[in-house]
Amino acid sequence: MDSLKFISWYETFLGEDGRKVYAETVLDKREMRTVHMFQVSGSEITVEDSILQKDDKIEVIRRVRANGTADTGIEKNGIAFGMEILLGEGKQLRYGIPSCRYSSGQAGKHTYMEERLTAPVIMAYDESARTAVSVARTRPPADTGKEIRKTGDSRYLHKTEVGSLGYEWREGRENILCARWPYEEMEMSVALDAKGTPVQAFYPIDGNAWEMELHYELQQTCDRTFTDGLYHVFTGLAEQFETEGHHIVSLPFTLKEEIICRETSLMRSYREFGGDGAGFFFHFDPRKGYGSEPSGFGTSFNTIPHSTYVHILEYGFTGRQNHTALILARDKGGEWIEKGEQVVDFFLKHCMMENGWVYSLYDLDREEPFFSFGDPDAPKLHYMDYRGAKGNYLRTMTEPVNDVLEYCKWYREQGHVKKQWLEAVMRYADLLVSLQNEDGSWYRAYEPDGTPVFMLEEPWMTEQERERGRKAASAIPIVFLCNLAEYLSEEVYSTDVENTEPAGSKRSVYLRAAVKAGEYVLSGGCREELFQGGTLDNPNVVDKEAAQYAMAGCWHLYEQTGERRFLEGAATAGKQFVTWNYIWNAPVKEGTVLAEKKFRTKGMGAINSIWCGGVVDIYSLFHIRELYLTGRETGDEFMIRMAEWISTAAHQIMSWPGDRMGFADIGMQPEGFGICPQGMDEGMIQKGDIWGTLGWIYSAGIDGVDRYIRELPQAEQKEEK
């Protein structure tokens, strides 16, 4: 740490000669202090830097003051300050930036707004030395104003406390950790447009006096793995922020009451059609009500709203028809048992082929199922545009069939056997087994005859990158196969009509396939500590859901086999999953819905490494049960605490009898929340925006919470209910 070199600089908004270095410091003693003064547009600017070394940590405090005088009659100016820490090594390091980066550094400069980060920290990890150096902003920004800019401006004035963190890798020469206030996003940003125009903000020099104090902490640690290093600094910051007032939101209702509200809305989205059709029309704008188009966001493929959302049924990914039918049958009983059967029967009749291959989308206008990709005439959803072949994704086939299996389990608990449903489930399971690769993986997508589909592959990709992307969804069937093996372990009758094969032998086939898949996940994502490809709208990128599915799959294998290696895999994936969720409350912009409703980011989940935490959603809820259980089994108290934070934060801005939130009914909630702008020059997301909603919000908000509550100690269950 004592060999680190600090370069301090400033840059003005009107300056044409770029940044100006005002200090270069090599840390050679425990405490250093420098003061610099300069004139900018007639205003005197003073910057005082204090550097204090404490064992393995270095505290940096930067105080900036403007004296409140400025030239009049000239164009408004602004200023930005930066700090670079030279690590002195040219080799490629692995960077951990929570919700942004989890892999080896790329050449060039890569910096991110602090409010985009689930924790304002960057870590550089040396995999050969197993050491990490991190820079964190230990007193994160609390206030931000509106950008002073017109459409197209990428350099602009902004009165904000928000800075940026990132890195620059000059290949073969040096690695640099970067901090700037106000923020910049270089060399690309999603804030303005889809082409990635970079942004730079400058604090206004407008004749008013102001002060800004910035606190950073550098830390060097020795950690066995990259994930351990990032988790180490992440959890440490979480503890610090908790003591400094970054608390989780307080809800005006219990989790049980939250479930009741959501189920009220879900029931009102149900309708029947044709002679045998039934489903939930749960894709809508909560501000406009049932039957409306969901409000928009952008993906790699399509931008919604799109009129087709009002006449399609979705059975997997962002809409779980069979799952919501089960929820209401289980919780409401009565007429919802018969209605639920109608939903599932329609799906099995119209969407499953004889070989077990599954359509997960049905078009009411055309009265037929349709492919998730490949059909140019099919309705447009946000996750499909590939034209090279017609087929469906592994995830969107597995989820609806697993939901039918869960339904079978529930019926058996009531003393009934849905044999035809179970036979359909096993047809799909047999298809999975037949499609499984020798290494235990599956491909991301398949045609109806089982031909794999490889999509979104760029010419510059290495073969390893292609293979990783093709097989990125391999963790997804594990939970299903474990559930089926568990179900069959209690069967005493034949489940194979043709071969009269005992349930026990089928159980071993499915469990063996799950174990093989788990071994692939352990040797791939867990060993490489890189989880990607969980979602379908921005595939082949590192994302939150990939880590979730790997954690959940490994946990279910641990439950089935008792093998420690799967618990260790769940812990590795779980640690990365944790870092996708905010541990601090990023500032919200006045005049927005988020400000009006006192929205807090702590406990909310980022989505993927494109948007990072710039937009958050509630879908960490899907597997907080597995996160909680992994934490309990491994003695990781922070996993347990994060599960609790997620279970609370995810219900913000949900309409309830005490506050309709401006929505059409109770139990409605936005699909997403804008923490940073995303494509704001293209009419997409402004900071403070809300949008949506898609139907999987009911699956996450009801069943994700219910599964978690059921695992809590009895005393805590009573408190939640």
What do the predicted segments below correspond to?
Residues 7-16, 224, 231-313, 341-342, ...:
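Low-complexity, Ser/Thr/Pro/Gly-enriched N-terminal "stalk/linker" regions
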Residues 262-280, 435, 501-509, 516-534, ...:
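Non-catalytic carbohydrate-binding regions of carbohydrate-active enzymes
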Residues 276-313, 358-393, 441-472, 530-553, ...:
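Carbohydrate-binding/catalytic loop surfaces
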Residues 6-15, 25-28, 34-41, 46-217:
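Beta-strand/loop-rich accessory regions of lumenal/periplasmic or secreted enzymes
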